Design a protein with these regions (language model features):
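Ordered, soluble secondary-structure elements with a strong preference for glycine-centered loop motifs
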Residues: 307, 710-714
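Short, gly/Ser/Thr-rich active-site loops of penicillin-recognizing serine hydrolases
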Residues: 601, 717-747
Length: 747
C-alpha cells in the first residue's frame, strides 16, 4: 500500500507539473503569436530603428523677388553656434568627468560601489569644471554676447527642454494609468536632450573654423552649424528726388538725394527663429496618423529653433518659401546609407516694383515736403507749418490687380527725421496703405453714380439741380460743401446757370447730386454696391445688409444720404479705394488686389454701361483739366495760378476728397499725453487712374491719403502728382526716362 500511495502521489505531481509546463508553453506561444502577428511589424521597426542612425539635412528658404526679378530677400550662407543640453543645463562637466572615470576604470567600474565611483568622478571634476568655464568665456567672446546674457540664453534652452521632457513624461504616466500599469517610472530621455540647440547666429567664417576645433576637442559641448541668414538687399537705398515739379513754395532745380532705410520692410516682412505653438499645431514635424503610426512631414515645424515667416510677404507665402528637409539613414549593422536630398523652398515673385516703391516712399517722406503742413494747405489752425502729417499711397495695376507699391509714413524710427511730429508715434508700426481705414469722403461719388445707373434709378445723362441743401426744411444739414458762409451760400446751379450732369457734378464734387442718387438707391442697395466695389472686403467697414435695412426701416434719410458722399458709418483702406477705381476702369470687373505677380484673378463682374463709365472718366479728367475742378490749380494771388498735377507723358483721371476725421490729439512734447484735441482737421484724399498720354488708356490705379491734411486737392493732390511722376520715371506710363538726374541705388 505504501508503495502504491507514493507512486500515485508522484504520478499526480508529474501530471500537475506537466500541465503547468503545457500552460506556460501555451502562454509563451500566445505571447509569441501576439508579438509576431499583431505587433511584429511595429517591434521589427523599433528594432531596426535601434540599428539605424538618422540625421536630418537642412533645407533653405526660397527667395522673394520683385516683379522685375530683383532680389528682395534671400538666404545666404551663414554659421550658427549650437550647444548641447548638458552644457546649457550646467551638467556637461559632470557628465564628462563621469565618462572619463568610467573609461579609466575599465571593467573594474562595474565592481565599484557608489561611493568609490563618486570619489573617482570628484577627482576629475575640477579640471572639467575649469574647461566648462573656459568654454563659457570663449562662447561669450566669439558670439559677441555678455557672459550673463549667454548664461541666460543657455538657461532658457535647458528650461524649455526640461518642460518638454516633463510634458512627455506626464503623457506617459497618463497612458500607464489608463492601462492600469505601475506609475513608479522615471522620465525617459527625449530627443531634444541629444540634439544641439542654437545659442548665437550669423558668426564669421573665421570664428566658425575656430569653434569647430574647440567642439572637436570638447565632445558633447558645442557644434558649429552650417546655416543661412536672410539678406534683404533693399534695406538701405538712396533715391534722388527731382524737385522741379513740386509746388512753388518748395520747388527747386536742385534734386534731393535721400537715404531710405527699410522702405520695403513692412511689405517684405521678416522671419523669426523659433517655432510658436500656432506653427506646431498647423504643421507639425511629426503627427500620429489614424493607424497610430507616426507620420513625418519634412517641411513641418519642430519645437525650438526654426526659421518661420513672421510678417509681410515672408508670412503670407510661408508654405511656398519653406523647403523640405533631407534625411540620411545609416544602418549601423551594414554601414549602408540611404539619403533623401533636401528640397529648397520655391522662389516667390512678388507684385512689388522695388524701385517704384522707393520713389513713392520718397514722395511721402517729410524731407520732400509734401506731407509737412505747408502754406498752401487748408488744414486746421491748430497745426503749424512744418508739422509732419501721417500719409499713405498705393499703386496697383488695373489689368491684374497686382500691387506695385504701397508706402506709408511715419514709420518706426522716423520721429527725428524731416519734420516735427505733433502726434503720438504709437501708430508708426501700422502700414496705412492697407492696415488703416478712413471715411472715404467724396471718393465714392463715381461709385454711387454707376450703382444708380445699374439699378435704374438714374439715367446716364441724369441732370440734378444743386440748391445748397438736400432737405428743403433743413438748411443746416446735408449741405453741399459750397453752401457755406465763406462762399456766400452759393450753389453749383447758380454758378453754371442750371442743373449739373455727372461730369460737372464729379468735377465740382457737388454733394447734392450724390445725396439724391443715394436717397433713390436706399441704404441697403447702396451698401450692397459698395461691397461689390470691394469696400469693406480688405479691412474696411461698410454697413451690413441688416444694418442698412434698419436705417431704412427707421426712416433715417440723413444717414443714408451721408453714405452717398462717403461719410457716416463706413471706413475704407487706401488699398480698397484703389481697387474700386480699378474696377471702374475695367468696366465692372472686380479683381482682388494681390501681392503675387501673376496671382490676380477676376472675382466678380458687374458690367457697367460703357456710356456711364465714359461719363465718369470725363468727369474725373475735368477734376484737373477744368478751372472749376477741385484738383485743378492753386491760386497764389495776383492772378498767379499753379496746376496741382503736372506729369509730362501721362494722362490721369482723378477725384479729390475731404473726409471728416476723428479728433486729432496733439502731443507736441512726445510724453504720450495729448495737450490738445482738434476737431476741425479733416483727412485729405485723392484717388484715380493713370495711363500714357499716347494711347489714353487707364493702366494703373492710385489712392493717396494725408491724415488731417484738410482739402484733398491742395494737400493730397501734390502727393498724387509725385506718384504719377514716379510711374513716368520708372517707365510705366509715357516714355521711359533715360538714366540721368533721377536714380535709385541700393546701398
Amino acid at each position: 500500500m505504501g508503495y502504491e500511495s507514493i507512486h500515485n502521489d508522484l504520478r499526480k505531481r508529474i501530471i500537475i507539473l506537466a500541465a503547468l509546463v503545457v500552460v506556460a508553453a501555451a502562454v509563451l506561444i500566445l505571447r509569441l503569436g501576439h508579438l509576431t502577428l499583431w505587433q511584429g511589424s511595429r517591434l521589427a521597426r523599433a528594432a531596426e530603428e535601434r540599428l539605424d542612425a538618422e540625421a536630418l539635412l537642412p533645407t533653405w528658404r526660397g527667395s522673394i523677388l520683385d516683379r522685375t526679378g530683383r532680389v528682395l530677400a534671400e538666404d545666404v550662407a551663414s554659421y550658427d553656434i549650437a550647444v548641447s543640453y548638458p552644457l546649457a543645463g550646467g551638467k556637461w562637466a559632470s557628465e564628462r568627468a563621469q565618462e572619463q572615470a568610467k573609461r579609466e576604470a575599465g571593467s573594474a567600474w562595474r565592481k565599484m560601489d557608489v561611493s568609490r565611483r563618486a570619489e573617482a568622478v570628484d577627482a576629475l571634476l575640477p579640471e572639467w569644471k575649469r574647461r566648462e568655464r573656459s568654454l563659457m568665456k570663449l562662447l561669450a567672446s566669439r558670439s559677441g554676447l555678455a557672459e550673463s546674457e549667454l548664461r541666460e540664453r543657455l538657461g532658457a534652452i535647458a528650461a524649455r527642454i526640461d518642460r518638454q521632457r516633463e510634458a512627455v513624461h506626464a503623457r506617459a504616466i497618463e497612458l500607464r494609468r489608463q492601462r492600469g500599469q505601475s506609475l513608479d517610472v522615471a522620465p525617459e530621455p527625449i530627443r531634444e536632450m541629444r540634439e544641439m540647440h542654437v545659442v548665437a547666429r550669423d558668426i564669421p567664417a573665421t570664428t566658425a573654423f575656430e569653434l569647430r576645433k574647440v567642439g572637436d576637442a570638447n565632445p558633447g559641448s558645442l557644434e558649429v552649424l552650417d546655416a543661412a541668414r536672410r539678406r534683404t538687399p533693399w534695406d538701405t537705398a538712396e533715391v534722388e528726388v527731382a524737385r522741379d515739379h513740386l509746388p512753388r513754395a518748395i520747388r527747386t532745380s536742385v534734386p534731393l538725394v535721400m537715404r531710405l532705410d527699410g522702405a520695403l520692410d513692412a511689405i517684405v516682412g521678416s522671419v523669426r527663429h523659433e517655432a510658436w505653438k500656432e506653427d506646431l499645431e498647423r504643421r507639425p514635424f511629426e503627427r500620429v496618423g489614424d493607424s497610430g503610426s507616426v507620420e513625418v512631414d519634412l517641411g513641418g515645424y519642430r519645437a525650438g529653433s526654426e526659421v518661420v515667416g513672421s510678417r509681410g510677404l515672408e508670412r503670407r507665402f510661408e508654405d511656398r518659401l519653406r523647403g523640405l528637409r533631407g534625411r540620411v539613414t545609416r544602418r549601423l549593422a551594414t554601414e549602408e546609407e540611404e539619403r533623401l536630398e533636401p528640397v529648397p523652398g520655391a522662389h516667390v515673385q512678388s507684385s512689388i516694383d522695388a524701385a517704384l516703391q522707393l520713389r513713392v516712399q520718397a514722395a511721402l517722406d517729410p524731407r520732400t515736403g509734401l506731407t509737412l503742413v505747408q502754406p498752401w494747405h487748408t488744414s486746421s489752425d491748430a497745426l503749424v507749418i512744418g508739422d509732419a502729417l501721417p500719409a499713405a499711397a498705393v499703386v496697383l495695376e488695373i489689368a491684374t490687380g497686382e500691387i506695385l507699391a504701397a508706402a506709408t509714413t511715419p514709420r518706426a524710427g522716423d520721429a527725428a527725421r524731416g519734420g516735427r511730429v505733433p502726434v503720438s508715434m504709437d501708430t508708426a508700426g501700422i502700414h496705412r496703405a492697407f492696415e488703416a481705414k478712413y471715411p472715404p469722403g467724396s471718393l465714392v461719388k463715381p461709385l454711387v453714380y454707376l450703382a444708380a445707373v445699374a439699378e435704374g434709378v438714374a439715367a446716364e445723362d441724369e441732370a440734378i439741380e444743386c440748391n445748397g441743401h438736400y432737405f428743403k426744411e433743413r438748411s443746416d444739414a446735408a449741405r453741399c460743401w459750397i453752401y457755406r458762409d465763406r462762399y456766400k451760400f452759393t450753389t453749383h446751379t447758380k454758378s453754371i446757370g442750371g442743373p449739373l450732369g455727372i461730369e460737372q457734378a464729379m468735377a465740382r464734387s457737388c454733394n447734392i447730386y450724390f445725396y439724391t442718387l443715394a436717397d433713390r438707391l436706399g441704404a441697403e442697395r447702396l451698401c450692397d454696391w459698395y461691397r461689390r466695389f470691394g469696400l469693406g472686403r480688405l479691412g474696411g467697414d461698410v454697413p451690413s445688409a441688416a444694418v442698412a435695412k434698419a436705417l431704412e426701416g427707421r426712416g433715417d434719410r440723413f444717414a443714408t444720404v451721408s453714405l452717398g458722399i462717403g461719410q457716416g458709418a463706413m471706413a475704407v483702406t487706401p488699398l480698397e479705394m484703389a481697387a474700386a477705381y480699378a474696377m471702374v476702369a475695367r468696366g465692372g470687373s472686380w479683381i482682388e488686389p494681390t501681392w503675387h505677380k501673376g496671382g490676380g484673378r477676376v472675382a466678380a463682374v458687374q458690367p457697367f454701361s460703357s456710356t456711364a463709365v465714359s461719363r465718369v472718366l470725363r468727369g474725373l479728367e475735368q477734376v484737373t483739366s477744368e478751372s472749376y475742378g477741385t484738383g485743378s490749380h492753386m491760386d497764389h494771388g495776383g492772378g498767379v495760378r499753379e496746376p496741382i498735377i503736372e506729369a509730362p507723358g501721362a494722362r490721369w483721371w482723378i477725384k479729390t476728397g475731404t473726409a471728416e476725421a476723428p479728433p486729432l490729439r496733439l502731443d507736441r512734447d512726445g510724453d504720450g499725453v495729448a495737450e490738445k484735441s482738434v476737431t476741425d482737421a479733416d483727412h485729405a484724399w485723392c484717388a484715380g487712374v493713370v495711363g500714357s498720354a499716347i494711347d489714353g488708356m487707364p493702366r494703373y490705379a492710385i489712392a493717396v491719403i494725408v491724415e488731417h491734411g484738410g482739402g484733398g486737392g491742395r494737400t493730397a493732390g501734390p502727393v498724387m502728382a509725385a506718384v504719377i511722376r514716379a510711374l513716368v520715371e520708372e517707365g510705366y506710363v509715357g516714355a521711359a526716362r533715360s538714366p540721368g538726374p533721377t536714380r535709385v541705388e541700393v546701398r
